[in-house]
Amino acid sequence: MKAVIISIGDELLKGHRVNTNAPFIARQLGTIGIPVSRIITCSDDPQSIRVAVTSALEEAEAVLMTGGLGPTNDDRTRTTVQELLGRGLVFDEPSFERIAEMFRRRGRPVTEAMKAQAMVIEGSVTVPNTKGTAPGMIIECAPQFAGRYLVLMPGVPVEMEAMMQLTVIPFFEPLSGAFIRHTPIMTMGIGESQLSGLIAQVEDELPSGTTLSYLPHAAGVSLMVSTSGSRKEEVDEQNRRVVDAIVERARSFVYAIRDARLEEVVVETLLEKKMTVAVAESCTGGLIASRLTDVAGSSGCFLQGLVTYSNEAKVAQLGVDPLTIEELGAVSEPVAEEMARGCLERSGADIAVSTTGIAGPGGGSPEKPVGTVCIAVASRSGKGDVTVEASTFSMHGDRQQNKARFSEAALRALLVRLKQPGS
């Protein structure tokens, strides 16, 4: 079985919205061994929808559509598909009751007009919308397209994602005829070419049915080990062996064997070690603190964050020596070290990280160009001694890109220190 994804909406074609639905659907289908052969984006025009659906049903056994199920005039997917298949619309009472209950909870009146949202194509399996109003549908398209299935879902990402996970994937899993295992390996502080060299032997000896993909990201490179086959136990075992071989060779660069953001692993590590953290930021403007506190459970380890953007704030809030700034400049490793030490001592945290740099577009010099950042990590030993280490990095990007990369480097430095023996 293979699939085609159709994303409907003029807003996608005009660039007013980024299509995040198609990648999500493709990833979900991949977990049950259904590859996507094509992704189509088409307008709200009924003829465009009709052409796209007909073409997709001729190509693939499963066609998944998003968009065009709402109550407005440009939501034409349901009507177009109904006419294409020569079927009527029927009222789905459970869907209407779900919609009505949602409106009652919000204190809004329930009207007859809402019944239009609960109309589904005759012969379809209703996909409950647990996050919104319009239900989805799974339609077996015989006799026109024997052995073909059409899935209609709303274009709102949160609604579509719930439908995929709760109903659509469980529906198609028994039909896929294959087992597939995807295992992500997240690395940091290493480029694609260097990583490829480290694991070249593993890649050269990949068993049949297993593939390896490189996906560069801000922290480093994520590897995706994918294994498919007809027997689940064999697929799992083969995938595990390849993952183990890669990790054995690249262990010092691997920070997670799952799809995880760097800040998630930092927080998890802090909680495991029962350690607390504080951050002192200049050029990143609170981004590190924001990323850490975005992680659920971070209140158990995150003490405080200071944005000491000016030199005066560095001196007053962190105890940085003004002579250090005067002699070496605010963007220097000694200043970063004093920021981290001051943050550690004044917060009472077990570990602290600091950033001072030049995000751009102005402020650079030949000696310290835009993209330069100094990052320091300070931590306490078991005896209470403080260790501080700083490094300088050079990034290339616009202001927002540099800030994001600076924060990534700081989180990476934090995690490296946390993983050191004795931390």
From Swiss-Prot:
SUPFAM superfamilies according to UniProt: CinA-like, Molybdenum cofactor biosynthesis proteins
Alphabetical list of Pfam families matching this protein: CinA, CinA_KH, MoCF_biosynth
SMART domains given in the database record: MoCF_biosynth
Domain of life: Bacteria
Entry-linked InterPro entries: CinA, CinA-like_C, CinA_C, CinA_KH, Competence-induced_CinA, MoaB/Mog-like_dom_sf, MoaB/Mog_dom
Recorded family membership: Belongs to the CinA family.
The protein's name in its UniProt record: CinA-like protein
